[in-house]
């Protein structure tokens, strides 16, 4: 019997390395893991593929999906809507595939409200100085924008206590190993093993 997959909520302030960690986890395209593909009303950027990077829909379609209670969570960001499909995630989990949601603390709260068993992982930078260095090192933003991003990061980090696991991304390889350890540990819980090893357990206990 295939054990149900786990839903992992991964949140972090900008610059903490969340996207890089998720990309590294999925680099070899493991059959038992995938990142959730969100719906959005924003226009596709160059190189983005519908169904791979996002499900691109118009505002009317998105609002219809809201009315149908089709999203685990949704939000409006800078005039564009983003949402996580309830049906797609449920279907994927029943196939024994772990799903990763790359969302902020507000989205995490919405998901936890409807799926309390979802596992929250928060990625932190090792220090404020290092976070600012990473944000500045991108060389793409003005000091005003960096200051705004730092303030937003502090606000995001204030919600770390709402998560089940905390990873400090001081060394990338160590942080990646920590992430893999969390995933492995969740697959070895009693509930997961009862499903995965049901036939063996019944055989062991047969009179």
UniProtKB/Swiss-Prot annotation:
Descriptive protein name: Guanylate kinase
Species this protein is from: Shewanella sp. (strain MR-4)
Pfam families: Guanylate_kin
Entry GO terms, CC: cytosol
Enzyme kind, highest EC tier: transferase
Domain of life: Bacteria
Purpose of the protein: Essential for recycling GMP and indirectly, cGMP.
Keywords: ATP-binding, Cytoplasm, Kinase, Nucleotide-binding, Transferase
Lineage: Bacteria, Pseudomonadati, Pseudomonadota, Gammaproteobacteria, Alteromonadales
């Amino acid at each position: 019997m295939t054990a149900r997959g786990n839903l992992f909520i991964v949140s972090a302030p900008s610059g903490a390395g969340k996207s890089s960690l998720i990309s590294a986890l999925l680099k070899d395209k493991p059959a038992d893991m995938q990142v959730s593909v969100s719906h959005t009303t924003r226009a596709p950027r160059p190189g983005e593929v519908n169904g791979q990077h996002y499900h691109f829909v118009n505002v009317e379609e998105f609002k219809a999906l809201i009315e149908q209670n089709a999203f685990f969570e949704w939000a409006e960001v800078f005039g564009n809507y983003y949402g996580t499909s309830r049906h797609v995630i449920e279907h994927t989990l029943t196939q024994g595939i772990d799903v990763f949601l790359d969302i902020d603390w507000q989205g995490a709260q919405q998901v936890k409200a409807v799926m309390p068993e979802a596992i929250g992982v928060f990625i932190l930078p090792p220090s404020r100085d290092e976070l600012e260095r990473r944000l500045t090192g991108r060389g793409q933003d003005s000091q005003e924008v960096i200051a705004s991003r730092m303030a937003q990061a502090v606000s995001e980090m204030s919600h770390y206590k709402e998560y089940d696991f905390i990873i400090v991304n001081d060394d990338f390889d160590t942080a990646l190993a920590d992430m893999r350890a969390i995933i492995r540990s969740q697959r070895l819980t009693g509930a997961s093993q009862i499903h995965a090893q049901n036939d063996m357990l019944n055989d062991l206990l047969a009179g």
